[in-house]
C-alpha cells in the first residue's frame, strides 16, 4: 500500500495529519528519538512530545523516557490494530444505542477534528447546495474547493465567497466568475463558516484549516436554526469587513426566483447599473399560508448589504419593496430559518422585469 494511502487511512481513523506523519516515521524505523521524528516529519521537537502523548493514548506507540534521548517505539501492528478494533466495537455499540433512542428526523450534528474530514464535509455541503452558499474560508482552501464551487456555479447556485488569511496562498489568474457570485478577501482569521441554503454547513476555528489546528474542532450541522445563526453571524460581523474582488454580472431579465435573497442580490446589481425594475410577485403574510399575487408592480427599494453599497437598516435585512395597489409592501425570504420578522410579508416567487432606464 502506498504510504500516502496509509496516511489517509490513519487520518480517516481520527489521527491529525501531523500525528499520522509522526507515527509513520516511528513505524518505519521501529523506534526513533524525538529529534529524528521532528526532522523527518518537519515539525518542532516540542510539538513531537505533544504528538507522542496522543499516539501513546491511542495505543500506537510507547514512550521510553528512561533513556537519553527519549525514544518513541512503535507497538506491533497486531497490538495497535487490536486497540483500534476494541474502540470500534465499543463505538459501534454506543452508536447503536443512540440510533435506537433517536427519533426519526433528528438533526445531524457532528464534531470533526481531522482537517481532511473537515474539507470533505465542506465540499459535501457545497455539492448539496441548491440555491445559495455563504462561505468564509482561508485562502489556502480555495484549491481544495475550486471544483465543488465551479460545479455549484454551473448548477445556478449563488455563492458569496470570502477568502481570508493567508491571502498569499491564493492562486494567480483565478476565473472568479466560475467560482463565485460575489467574492471578497480579508486579511484576518475569522472562524471558518460554510452555510448552504441556510439549512446545513460547517463551522470551526480558523486554525482547523490553516496552520496548526491542535485541539480545534469543527461543527458539522444540518439543522436550520443552527445554520441560520451561523449565517446571520457571518453576514453581520465578517462579510462587511472584506474587500471586494469580484461581482458577477446580474441575471438577464426577465428572471424568476423562488429564492428571494438571490432575487434581492440581482435586483441590487441591476439598480446599481442604472436600471429600474418592475416585478410580478407572489407574497404571503407572515403567519398565514394564503398568498396574494401582484403583477407588473414597481420595485421601489432594495434592502441588503451583500453586494454594493449597504441599503439595509439592520445586518440581516434582505428584502424587496413593491409599490402595489394596496400600498408599499416589503417582502423578505420564504425559506431557510430567517423567516421575515421585520417586513411582515414573505415573497414566495418574484419575476424581475426591466423597467424604464433611469437617466
Which stretches of residues belong to each language-model region?
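Basic, Lys/Arg-rich alpha-helical nucleic-acid-recognition elements, primarily the DNA-binding modules
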Residues: 1-82
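Surface loops and adjacent helix of pleckstrin homology
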Residues: 66, 75, 138, 164, ...
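PLD-like (HKD) phosphodiesterase/transphosphatidyltransferase domain
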Residues: 81, 87-154, 158-159
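Primarily the HKD phosphodiesterase
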Residues: 129-176, 287-301
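HKD (HxKxxxxD) catalytic microenvironment of the phospholipase D
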Residues: 181-234
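Anionic-ligand-binding alpha/beta catalytic cores of soluble enzymes and soluble regulatory domains
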Residues: 212-269
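N-terminal accessory interaction module
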Residues: 262-358
Amino acid at each position: 500500500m502506498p504510504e500516502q494511502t496509509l496516511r489517509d487511512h490513519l487520518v480517516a481513523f481520527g489521527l491529525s495529519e501531523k500525528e499520522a506523519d509522526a507515527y509513520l516515521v516511528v513505524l518505519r524505523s521501529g523506534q526513533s528519538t524525538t529529534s529524528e521524528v521532528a526532522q523527518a516529519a518537519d515539525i518542532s521537537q516540542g510539538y513531537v512530545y505533544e504528538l507522542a502523548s496522543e499516539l501513546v493514548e491511542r495505543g500506537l506507540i510507547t514512550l521510553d523516557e528512561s533513556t537519553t534521548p527519549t525514544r518513541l517505539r512503535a507497538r506491533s501492528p497486531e497490538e495497535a490494530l487490536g486497540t483500534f478494533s476494541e474502540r470500534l466495537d465499543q463505538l459501534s455499540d454506543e452508536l447503536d444505542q443512540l440510533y435506537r433512542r433517536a427519533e426519526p428526523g433528528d438533526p445531524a450534528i457532528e464534531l470533526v477534528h481531522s482537517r481532511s474530514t473537515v474539507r470533505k464535509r465542506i465540499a459535501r455541503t457545497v455539492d448539496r447546495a441548491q440555491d445559495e452558499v455563504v462561505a468564509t474560508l482561508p485562502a489556502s482552501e480555495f484549491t481544495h474547493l475550486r471544483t465543488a464551487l465551479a460545479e455549484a456555479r454551473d448548477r445556478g447556485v449563488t455563492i458569496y465567497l470570502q477568502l481570508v488569511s493567508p491571502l498569499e496562498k491564493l492562486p494567480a489568474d483565478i476565473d472568479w466568475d466560475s467560482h463565485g457570485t460575489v467574492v471578497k478577501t480579508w486579511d484576518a482569521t475569522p472562524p471558518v463558516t460554510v452555510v448552504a441554503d441556510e439549512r446545513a454547513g460547517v463551522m470551526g476555528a480558523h486554525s482547523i484549516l490553516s496552520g496548526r489546528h491542535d485541539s480545534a474542532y469543527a461543527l458539522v450541522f444540518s439543522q436550520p436554526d443552527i445554520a441560520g445563526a451561523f449565517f446571520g453571524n457571518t453576514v453581520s460581523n465578517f462579510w462587511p469587513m472584506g474587500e471586494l474582488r469580484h461581482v458577477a454580472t446580474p441575471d438577464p431579465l426577465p428572471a424568476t426566483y423562488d429564492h428571494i435573497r438571490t432575487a434581492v442580490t440581482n435586483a441590487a446589481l441591476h439598480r446599481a447599473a442604472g436600471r429600474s425594475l418592475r416585478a410580478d410577485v407572489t407574497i404571503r403574510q407572515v403567519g398565514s399560508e394564503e398568498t396574494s399575487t401582484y403583477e407588473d408592480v414597481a420595485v421601489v427599494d432594495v434592502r441588503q448589504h451583500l453586494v454594493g453599497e449597504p441599503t439595509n437598516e439592520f445586518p440581516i435585512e434582505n428584502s424587496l419593496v413593491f409599490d402595489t395597489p394596496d400600498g408599499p409592501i416589503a417582502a423578505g425570504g420564504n425559506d431557510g430559518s430567517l423567516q421575515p420578522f421585520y417586513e411582515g410579508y414573505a415573497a414566495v416567487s418574484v419575476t424581475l422585469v426591466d423597467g424604464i432606464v433611469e437617466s
